[in-house]
Every structure is written in structure tokens, then in C-alpha cells.
Amino acid sequence: MKPTEEKIQGNASDLPVYLFKQGNNCEAYRYFGAHLETRAGEPGVVFRVWAPHAVAISVVGDFNSWKPGSHPMHKVDGDSVWELFIPGMKEFDVYKYCVTTRAGDLVYKADPYAFHAETRPSNGSKVYDISGFAWHDEAWQAAQKKADVINGPMNIYEMHVGSWKMKEGNKPYNYAELADQLIPYITEMGYTHVELLPVMEYPFDGSWGYQVTGYFAPTSRYGTPKDFMTFVDKLHAAGIGVIMDWVPAHFPKDQFGLYNFDGEPCYEDPNPKRGEHKEWGTMVFDFGRNEVQSFLISSALYWLEQYHIDGLRVDAVASMLYLDYNRKQGEWEPNKDGGKENLEAVAFLRKLNDTVLGRHPHKYMIAEESTAWPMVTKPASDGGLGFNFKWNMGWMNDMLSYMKTDPLFRAGNHNKVTFSFFYAFSENFVLPISHDEVVHGKGSLINKMPGEYEAKFANLRTFFGYMMAHPGKKLLFMGQEFGQFAEWNEAKQLDWMLLGYDKHTELKNYAKTLNAFYKDHPAFWQVDYSWEGFQWIVPDDSQQSVIAFLRKDTAGKQILVVCNFNPVLREGYTLGAPVAGTYKEVLNSDDAAFGGSGAVHNKPVRTHKKPMHGFEQSITITLPPMSTLYFEVPTKRTAKTAADKAKKPGKKTTKAAPAEKAVKKPGRKPKAAPEAPTEKDAKKPGRKPKAAEAPAEKPVKKPTRKAKAEPEPAAEEAPKKRGRKPKAAKE
């Protein structure tokens, strides 16, 4: 290398290293790792790595027969950053760093900043050039920058790349092939986004990707980095957003990974009472260390910028926030103020979200947070954590508990259906029915439903209808949309053969219809996080297990939602109506096309002047057993103006009708309550609505069509031991 080139290279390294050590290098991957480069006219690869405790480091690989010391690195800053340019190395060459520790040991480490890696069980890093990919998603990107992130539709299909669908011989598709299989299905079903379980490189299949060793490398199980770019590009071209699970909370102890990278803690907290999750067998990042902040924030931006990912679902946030998370007395130490909050992690999350959303306000930063921590989705400047969405784990736990309850006993658990509405607008919530709920012996979603075969489907249809209408964005794990009976197994594809049976095909059709209804009706997504988009009508008919409420859009259009959580036909059910006029049934979960009985369809029903539930008029309808109904609410009629009358001279005119009185709200608007890990019974609204009128209960009518017989699901085997244990909600 010529002296002038050396000088330029030296100066160029000063700024990224300085920013890295300050915790402010948000693109550290451009400097660290392995990069193809030409020096003095000779092509090769420059390697850079951070190892503050190392005595010596050399690059080893096939090119030097993995001989330690043959290609030694040197410090570029006289402190902790090591560099070496090796001429002649090329793309896809495998390498590792051989680190000499202060104890005199040699440890072989994969590159923390590698763009590509060997496929397990091998674990070497690979030289890879991520530049030069031809993207075709300009229209998608432009539209996203103009979109209203908070007040737009979001209906997420959560999936595992390797087990959604497989080739013959139980072999997974690569990223590009999977896109061609997935796009027609997602388009047909009408989901707006897919969310991928972690695709960052990981060694153990049974961890599902949550034990990451390569924070800048898409797992090579399914192809190259550019194959993954192709996957994202194709989905964007089809109008489908892509969200990724991202895991900054912890990392595994694999010897080739980040653990004790140079023989001592670098990435993990050195305090054993803070630096390890013993239950998970993983290490906790040192969130207060500047170099670790640069590493993690660079990883987040890398996926959003280099792979055009639309958002990150940040895993296990609760475990980051609390020093006593899953730790017994004596296993943790309080913070400097004597509390249990991890102050460094809180500061890191605020910095992460400020940085990401400061650059990309149209991206999603979604917290998987299961406790009562306040203001998760409020700006850091206001004391919040700065996410723009949060999973509503309280709603999920309450509703799955309620749906598992025998309908005979649901009256005594009615608060589980209504409690979430008391805090629904305290955060920007996503309603998650995720992979965590269909593993580890918990059973699939349909197998959580009580009753025999037909009853399970009826319960699930009712739940899906309720979920779609509840304020908040939506997320459903793959396979639940067609009623997979078996728990999810990452080693097998979904049970697509079930679509050969009527009930499963009909359930899939129902999910598809619900998704289309959601997308086509802004009342279900435009005002998700304010009382302006929701109003109770019947919150407390616990004896009949019925609720009714309104969803509203900004133009004043409304949908009336009525849920009957009991397998009992209810004729003559009267409830308050917000507007006088004709109400039309627009969706019925008990429709025969969806696998229901098809016995009841409400014809357009006019209001009658009978005040109820705080409204001046009411309607009387029939509720099918175990069902969710949607009704189109008539628009408010206004009085004719003088100009309107003058349009038809000579004709007899009538007096303009008096303006309608303001609609009286039912009861007192409940104050939003914070979500709590152990949720107490909800208080009833300030004003108790009149009891809905209903005659004696009638027996359920049997289905009018006979479904194709399906074998009874076999008893499920006990789940295999996973690399990652299920996360317990914070008590």
C-alpha cells in the first residue's frame, strides 16, 4: 500500500472507531466485519473486530489451513479494535478469528459482524458482499413513507420460515422459492403483513431463532443474504409488508459466538447477577456499554435499511426492563436507586427507538412486553420507552382463558371479555395470538376451544370475529387460520392436508372473509387508540354472555358488533341503537359458508322508538348460538335546508325536521386503566344498561349440511425440550 493510501485509510478509521466507542456508530457493520476491498491494486478482504481484552488475534480459514498466528491482526487504535487486510481472499471464503486470551488460551470465534455464515452444524463466517442487489420495491417504499403508521390497517400473519410449507422429503424452501409459495396465499387471505420468527443466524433449530449468534446474517438454512433480499423484494412488490423478530435481550453461550468473546465478558454484563438468564441458559447484553449499544443499534438499522424490513418486533422486552426478571431472592442486585428496574436497559431502549424512528418514522418498533410498565408506546421525551406498538399480552391471556372456559361457566368470567377495554387506549396495542400460545403442551388454538368437534369450530369463529373488531392491530400465528389441531412443530410443515376437510376449508374461508372486511372498513382500524373509535352498547350482559359495541371511523361510519359467547339461540334480543334507521347484517360467523348452522340470518331491521342503553331508539335481533355478528349502522340523516327545498318549485314543501338530538353515551366513559400483570375484575361502567330482552333459551339447531368426515385428532405427544423456555409473564 502506498503511504498516501495508508494515511487516508488511517484517517477514515478514526471517526467510526470514535463513534463506536461513544455508542453512536449506528452503522458499525460498514466498518467492522469482513469487507471486499482493493489495496495497492490488489483485491482482497479487510477484517476488523472489537476485542478489548485480547492479547493477540489472527484470521484463520481454509486459505491458511486454519493455522493460528499465520495472519496476525494489529490494533488500529492502540486499544481494542483489530484489523488485517488479506490479499487474494474472495466472496464465500470461510474464516474465524483465533483469539489469544489473557489467560493464554486460544478461542476460535465467528465474526460478530459477518454478513453470511456456514449452515449448522458448521459455524464459520463467510465473506459476503451485500451490495449490488437490484431492488424493485420503490413504489412500496414511497407509499410507506406517506402512510399513517398508527392509524392504518395492520393484520399480521406470524410465521416460521422453515416450517410454513416444505418440499418433498421434508426439505425447506429457500427464501426466494418461499416467496413464490407464500405470496399467492397471503394475497388470497388478505393479510397486510407477515412477521417472521427470527431469521438472524442461530445454531439450534429448537430455539426457533431466538438464540442468535449472527446479528447481521440471515440464517443460511434458507439461502444467501441476497436470497433473503429477494424474498422481501417480492413481498413488497405484491403489496405485503415484512416484519422481523429481533432479539436484543440475550444471546446463547455457544463457544464460537459472542459469549466471553476474547476470553472475558465483552458483549454480556460482567456482573453474574445481571449478565445471565439461568432459566433460559443465555447471557444478557451489557446495555450500558457504549460498544454494545453501537453493535445492537447498528443491527436494528441494518435490517431496516439494507434488507428493507418494515419493522422489528423486539423480543422479551420485559426481561430487559427488570433486574429481578425470572430471578429468585439473592440472585439479583438492585439498581443504584435501590429499585428493580434495569436503568441501563431503559436508557438503551429509548436510544434505540429514538434513533430508528428518528431516521425512519414510517417503520414499526413493536415491543413484546408482558408487564404493567407504563408508557411503552409514548415518546422517550415524555418519559416513555419510545416504541410505536406493544403486544397486548393481558388481552391475550384473559381471552384465551375465557375461551377455554366451558360456556356454562362463562357468566362468572365475563370480566375477562370486558377488562381489556378499560386500558385498550393506554398504549398502541397489537392483539397477538402468537407462536408462544401453540407450543409446550399448550395445545393449538382450536384445541383450546371447549366442546366436541363442531363446538370447537363455532367457538373459534366467534373468537376470531370478536378479535377482529376489538381495538388494536391484529396478529395470528400460521396454521390457526384453518384450525390446525396439532401443536406447531418447527421440524414439520403445517398440516395442509386438513384443507381436504370441509370444516377446515370453511374456517379458512371465514378468516379470509374477516380479513377482507377488516381491510375494507376503516372503522376497524382507523381509530384504534382512542375512545373516539369505540363505544359500548352492552358491556355487562354476563348472564347471557353477550356483549355489543360500536367501532367508528373518522368519517362517522359505524359498525355494530354483537358477540354471543354461549351456544344458545337468542331470539328477540333488544339493544340500544345509536342512529334511527335500518340496520343490515353484513357478517355472521354462523353462516353455513363458514361451517356454521346457517339457521339464522337477520333481515334488515328498523329501529323502534324504545329507549335502551342510553340511546333514544333500539333494535331487536336474533343471535345465533355461539356467534359474532356485524351490522352496518345507518348514517345520520340531516334536515333539509332552505336551498334543498327551493330546488323543486311549485311542489308542496314540508317543514324541515328538527335536528337530531345528541346521542347520549351509555353510562360513564371508563377511565383507561394501566395494564397489569395480574388483572383484577373490571369495574362495571358507571351506568348499568337495561338488561337485554330475550325469551327463554332455545336448543341449538344442528347444522344443515353434513361435513366431510375427519379423523379425530390423535392425542399429542409431550413436547420436546426446547432450547428456549417459554417466557413467563412478569408478576
Regions found by a protein language model. Give the residues of each.
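Short glycine-biased active-site loop of nucleotidyltransferases that positions the nucleotide triphosphate
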Residues: 74, 205-209, 253-260, 377-378, ...
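Substrate-binding/active-site clefts of carbohydrate-active enzymes
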Residues: 118, 138-151, 160-341, 605
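Carbohydrate-interacting/catalytic domains
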Residues: 1-153, 176-186, 454-457, 466-476, ...
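Arg/Lys-rich, glycine/proline-spaced intrinsically disordered segments
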Residues: 638-644, 648-671, 681-690, 699-706, ...
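Conserved alpha/beta catalytic core and glycan-binding cleft of carbohydrate-active enzymes
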Residues: 308-310, 325-491, 498, 519-590, ...
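Short, flexible loop/turn elements at secondary-structure junctions
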Residues: 51-53, 77, 88, 160-165, ...
